[in-house]
């Protein structure tokens, strides 16, 4: 209920009064991960940074003071995080105690998360079957589907990062998200290459075709969270004047 009143007040202050405050915090709690994904550099880290409970508490309190009221806990793989007797659920409870209206986690779903106390859960899904496994590892897709089903969480959504190896799976992944009773929605983004991952870049012409496909699917009622205007802005910069 508090968020119902806070959102229009935040919008009024930002748009009318010109007071710029953050609304959401994305907090990376650890670089530790259990996969070696093609598009990610985290697994190459020999000494991953893992934030302490105290440090995370300070960062959450700081974000709250700035005006943020929604937090997304990410990694690495956040379900692996712990500090003594504190685990990921401890951070979710801490977020609520501080005053955040919602605490979300983003996971690769390789490990079970049926005991998660998060308000909502984002699962990284980079295509169906072999497409997902080609990027994240053999057998990972099967475990993802199993863990989503067994989680029994009412607010699970998936996010697909599109690249040159999985773009052919975009349409079937959108349809999978619609048909799966355990998934609420899907968000789609594109891989931004950095040194060592250039081969994953999807050329601008094909990217434009994929975006047009996503827009058609959205207009046909598929549960795609991206806005049409936002999708159009993902096209080649030269497409807009």
Model-derived regions: residue spans:
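Conserved alpha-helical substructure of the radical SAM core
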Residues: 1-115
């Amino acid at each position: 209920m508090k968020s119902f009143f806070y959102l229009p007040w935040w919008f009024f202050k930002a748009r009318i009064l010109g007071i710029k405050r953050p609304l959401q915090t994305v907090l990376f709690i650890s670089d530790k991960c259990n996969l070696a994904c093609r598009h990610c550099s985290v697994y190459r880290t020999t000494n991953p940074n893992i934030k302490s409970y105290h440090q995370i508490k300070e960062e959450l309190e700081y974000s709250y003071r700035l005006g943020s009221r929604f937090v997304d806990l990410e990694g690495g793989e956040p379900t692996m995080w712990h500090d003594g007797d504190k685990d990921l659920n401890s951070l979710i409870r801490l977020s609520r105690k501080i005053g955040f209206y919602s605490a979300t986690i983003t996971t690769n779903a390789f490990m079970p998360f049926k005991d998660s106390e998060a308000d909502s859960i984002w699962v990284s899904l980079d295509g169906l079957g072999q497409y997902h496994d080609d990027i994240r590892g053999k057998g990972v897709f099967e475990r993802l589907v199993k863990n989503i089903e067994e989680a029994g969480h009412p607010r699970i959504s998936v996010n697909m990062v599109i690249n040159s190896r999985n773009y052919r799976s975009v349409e079937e992944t959108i349809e999978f998200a619609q048909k799966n009773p355990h998934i609420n929605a899907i968000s789609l983004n594109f891989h931004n290459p950095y040194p060592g991952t250039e081969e994953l870049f999807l050329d601008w012409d094909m990217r434009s075709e994929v975006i047009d496909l996503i827009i058609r699917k959205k207009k046909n009622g598929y549960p795609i969270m991206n806005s049409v205007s936002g999708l159009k802005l993902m096209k080649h910069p030269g497409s807009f004047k």
